[in-house]
């Protein structure tokens, strides 16, 4: 999986890693619904699974 920045500005394969405005504020997966396309919130980052 790949880690992305808090601002979601890293792009993988030409596409944003997660939607604009998506930020993980929790240390767990409570905000995972804000990350789409297989990305999940973990440790305040959106990770690709």
UniProtKB/Swiss-Prot annotation:
Q: Which keywords accompany this UniProt record?
A: Disulfide bond, Neurotoxin, Secreted, Toxin
UniProt subcellular location: Secreted
Q: Major location, coarse class?
A: secreted
Q: Which GO terms describe its cellular component?
A: extracellular region
Q: Where are the transmembrane segments?
A: none
| InterPro entries cross-referenced by the UniProt entry | Hwtx-2-like
A GO molecular function annotation here is: toxin activity
Going by the entry's taxonomy, the superkingdom of the source organism is recorded as Eukaryota
Q: In which tissues is it expressed?
A: Expressed by the venom gland.
Which cysteines pair up through disulfides? They are 4-17, 8-41, 22-24, 35-46
**What family is reported?**
Belongs to the neurotoxin 12 (Hwtx-2) family. 04 (lasiotoxin) subfamily.
What's the miscellaneous note? The primary structure of the mature peptide is identical to that of U1-theraphotoxin-Lp1a (Lasiotoxin-1) from Lasiodora parahybana (AC P0CC18) and U1-theraphotoxin-Lsp1a from Lasiodora sp (strain IBSP 8539) (AC P0CC19).
* Function recorded in the entry: Toxin that causes irreversible contractile paralysis into adult Aedes aegypti resulting in 100% mortality after 24 hours.
Q: What is this protein's record name?
A: U-theraphotoxin-Lk2a
Organism in which the protein naturally occurs: Lasiodora klugi (Bahia scarlet tarantula)
């Amino acid at each position: 999986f790949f880690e992305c920045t808090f601002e979601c500005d890293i792009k993988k394969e030409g596409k944003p890693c997660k939607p604009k405005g998506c930020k993980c504020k929790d240390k767990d997966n409570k905000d995972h619904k804000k990350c789409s396309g297989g990305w999940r919130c973990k440790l305040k980052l959106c990770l690709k699974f």
